[in-house]
Amino acid sequence: MGVADDRPLGSMDGGAAFFAVMNDIGLREVRLTVIWDPAHPTTIENQARIEALVPVATLRGIRIVFSVPPARARSITGSPGAPQRYAAFLQQLARTFPTVRDFIVGNEPNQPRFWQPQFDARGHAVSPAAYEALLARSYDALKAVDPVITVLGGGLSPRGNDNPSAPGNNSVSPVRFIQGLGAAYRASGRKAPLMDELAFHPYPRKDTDGLKVGYQWPNAGVTNLGRLKQAFWDAFRGTPQKTFERGLRMRLDEIGWQVAVVPQARGSYSGAENIRPTTEAAQAAIYSGLVRYIACEPSVDSILFFGLQDEPVLERWQAGLVRADGSPRPSYRAVRATLARGGGDCRGRMRRWRHSSKVDGAGAVFPRSRRLPSRVDSWSFLASTGEDAVFEAGVYRAAGSRLGSRVLGETGRLDANLARVVRFPSRRLSPGRYVYSIRFRAATNKTRTRQLTSRPFVVFHSR
């Protein structure tokens, strides 16, 4: 449990006061940003300040994590030699600070703000493959310096629209990004892992959302971590890269709910709010609930609140446990109390996860009529899934517990969370007993299937 916050890098005391606040709350991990700039590929930004900070953090029992994003969205893709120079910089950073053992490669590569291009001219997502190549090179470079270094991949945003034509934000959803990452890994023929942990940023869809609201597929929030685990299993099963069933872990290295400024602290802020924030009371309940919820999630290594203290400009970020004026929010006391009461220990049932072999949310609404005259020539039913899928459907002769011969057929695809009418070619059926049946296959893994069959219905002779 900790924070992602670069504020201690700007302090004159090596972060001592900042870390004292963390200690008071019970937080034990800080993520610091070290930007790689291709214009100055061997310059460690804030090196002297980091050198002053590391021993202070160690004394305070604070683990340091380096997040190493490229300076610009095209810093990696803009030059053929950039991935190699970035990996060399990681080695330089690891040798300069040998007591830091956790490195996050890049930041939100599924978002155009941090990685471009996301799509090619044909509309195909290209960011997963480009990032896979960088991650593979970075993993090998860091392990060559010290095999015990933990390499974190992803740092994924919780949302993406998968729309190459979206104005200004043509992004890739986390599920589809992981799918593309796995496809690139398999195509590369690599025999070593890509990462030791998956980094993920499960921000809420809206700051007014409760902790357990989550997202629809293919995006994901705190309560949808199983969706990411399934995506990872679909992408990497049977490869040298661990899946969550084989011990892969996850680090939620950015999370936060932005809060409205209370009147007594208004003088410490400037500008105008650009989102609809939640209340301080709601944030406190969410943060303490988050600590308890994740305590029962054995695959999560840690949670990092994004920002211990608010930024004073309202157009920026205000999700801290501390207000801009330095006063503690209710969430400060709530998290501290939860941790002090053993909130980091699971008090309920551990959420043990196993991969699914079925299609999530696959369902069908078949006609209720059990007897139909032979003059009927229209046949259809409603199908839906919780994830993208393809289907093969038919009207079959009923043959006990098995399907008989197919007399009508239809194939197609289903978009997640959108019901579709499966309509068969117009045709009269000869008298007899029939059933509808549909077989779903998950779009991200065709070996995951589900078959649904209706109760039998009778077609009887009519004039």
Each PLM stretch: what is its role?
Residues 1-35:
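Boundary/entry segment of secreted carbohydrate-active catalytic domains
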Residues 22-168, 205, 310:
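Substrate-binding cleft and catalytic face of glycoside hydrolase catalytic domains
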Residues 41, 109, 113-114, 120-125, ...:
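Aromatic-rich peripheral "rim/lid" segments of glycoside hydrolase catalytic domains that contact
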Residues 67, 82-87, 126-280:
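Noncatalytic carbohydrate-binding groove/subsite architecture in carbohydrate-active enzymes
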Residues 377-385:
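Aromatic/hydrophobic beta-strand junction motif of beta-rich domains
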Residues 401-432:
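Glycine-centered tight-turn motifs at strand-turn-strand junctions
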Residues 442-448:
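Short, solvent-exposed loop/turn segments at the edges of extracellular beta-sandwich modules
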